[in-house]
């Protein structure tokens, strides 16, 4: 289904007849493609209370940055990663008259800044110790890839050869006295939802969780589910470090999810993209062949940290583990998303190294990439991008810069202009619903 989210649809018909084979855009060597930025927030309160901070005034689950944060008159300092267009954060707290929201203004011209927030006087204390026991950090977004690396995609640069939604939640104990009995709750919960596949070649998608040493992982759990709307799901398979399914509701559908801890950082891989759609209309990208509301194939990964109160765990080790998990959210550069094609090529985003198992990068790249900048050619062209909001993906054969008309100027201005380009779509395929 073709949808418009702009009043101006003149000349947009889903074809590229007027396009040439020339480079769609030219990016500078130093452009980092960042769609998010870091802010430091200090939070204090006249009395002990629990708050949550969001990146949008609707305070939806998708815009949650940190939840159930216990604050008091002693200032709590946070490092948060927010969408780059964000001008205001929103602090939600409980008051005597119910839930309230307080805006926190930001400086949009600064990548790294410090802002202070003081919870209003009408806040109330948490109702139980359990309510104040754990905080969690949250990060979500959409990853989109082209499968033509090391060649540019030309007139087919629609960034929809693989599209998946990602969601990461890190839980940590914020009351030391709860750690001995409740420390097993600390860790990472991550979901990867396969939204669309518009390419013939992709077979797998994955992510390297950079900086998370395997010594900080005590237990792993894998689930494969079908994720519907309003929180509905159908469990298909479970396991510890691997889960596999070969049939879904009577239809052939191979899917295997693994957690690989053989390298320096854990690697999560979902294999099974080959069974999605066909080689004519593909999967959820071609107008007229998009099934609205179709449940998405989901990989759910849970990594449980070592209980930091266990005997033999030093304070330095405890702090290092806490930082390693938290930084998966607050330093999103540690999220190394990628896809794998039928000939075993790995395609990552700009600047990210391939995994330890892909040893043919130098040969396969054919000398077309920038020196010392993996997966970025000498025109600045890239094959993957992630956006920290739930944007739609482009329809098949619609140039990404046509679907998102502010995108090209954002790239060619080194990110100085149109920071909110991903909020302004012209032609796209509607995404499946998510919570």
Question: Predicted regions: what is each one?
Answer:
Residues 2-26, 31:
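Bacterial Sec-dependent N-terminal signal peptides
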Residues 16-22, 67-71, 96-121, 164:
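Structured interaction patches on ligand/partner-binding surfaces of diverse proteins
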Residues 37, 45-64, 159, 204:
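Short, ordered, surface-exposed loop/turn motifs in non-cytosolic proteins
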Residues 60-76:
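Short, acidic Ser/Thr/Gly-rich low-complexity loop/linker segments typical of extracellular
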Residues 101, 115-137, 141-151, 197-254, ...:
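Short helix/strand-capping turn motifs
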Residues 166, 186-196:
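Short, well-ordered beta-strand segments enriched in hydrophobic/aromatic residues
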Residues 428-435:
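Conserved small/polar residues in nucleotide/adenosyl-binding loops
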């Amino acid at each position: 289904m073709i949808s418009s989210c702009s009043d101006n649809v003149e000349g947009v018909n889903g074809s590229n007849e007027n396009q040439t084979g020339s480079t769609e855009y030219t990016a500078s060597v130093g452009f980092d493609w960042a769609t998010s930025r870091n802010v430091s927030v200090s939070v204090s309160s006249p009395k002990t209370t629990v708050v949550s901070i969001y990146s949008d005034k609707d305070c939806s689950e998708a815009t949650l940055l940190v939840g159930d944060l216990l604050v008091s008159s002693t200032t709590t300092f946070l490092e948060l990663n927010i969408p780059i267009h964000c001008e205001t954060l929103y602090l939600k707290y409980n008051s005597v008259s119910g839930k309230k929201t307080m805006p926190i203004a930001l400086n949009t011209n600064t990548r790294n800044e410090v802002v202070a927030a003081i919870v209003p006087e009408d806040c109330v204390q948490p109702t139980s110790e359990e309510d104040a026991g754990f905080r969690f950090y949250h990060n979500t977004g959409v990853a989109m890839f082209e499968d033509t690396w090391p060649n540019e995609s030309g007139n087919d640069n629609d960034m929809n050869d693989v599209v998946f939604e990602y969601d990461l939640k890190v839980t940590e104990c914020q009351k030391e006295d709860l750690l001995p009995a409740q420390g097993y709750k600390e860790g990472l919960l991550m979901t990867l939802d396969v939204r669309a596949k518009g390419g013939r070649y992709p077979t797998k998608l994955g992510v390297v969780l950079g900086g998370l040493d395997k010594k900080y992982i005590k237990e792993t759990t894998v689930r494969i589910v079908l994720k519907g709307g309003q929180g509905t799901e159908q469990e298909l398979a479970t396991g510890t470090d691997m889960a596999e399914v070969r049939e879904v509701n009577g239809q052939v559908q191979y899917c295997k999810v693994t957690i690989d801890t053989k390298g320096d950082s854990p690697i999560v891989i979902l294999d099974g993209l080959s069974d999605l759609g066909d080689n004519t209309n593909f999967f959820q990208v071609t107008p007229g062949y998009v099934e609205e509301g179709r449940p998405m194939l989901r990989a759910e990964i849970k990594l449980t940290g070592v209980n930091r109160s266990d005997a033999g765990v030093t304070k330095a080790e405890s702090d290092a583990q806490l930082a390693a998990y938290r930084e998966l959210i607050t330093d999103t550069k540690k999220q190394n998303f990628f896809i794998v094609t039928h000939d075993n090529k790995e395609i990552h985003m700009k600047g990210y190294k391939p995994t330890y198992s892909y040893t043919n990068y130098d040969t396969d790249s054919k000398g077309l990439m920038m020196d010392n900048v993996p997966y970025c050619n000498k025109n600045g062209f890239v094959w993957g991008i992630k956006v920290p909001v739930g944007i739609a993906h482009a329809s098949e054969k619609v140039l990404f810069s046509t679907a998102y008309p502010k995108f090209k100027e954002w790239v060619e201005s080194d990110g100085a202009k149109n920071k909110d380009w991903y909020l302004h779509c012209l032609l796209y395929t509607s995404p499946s619903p998510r919570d």
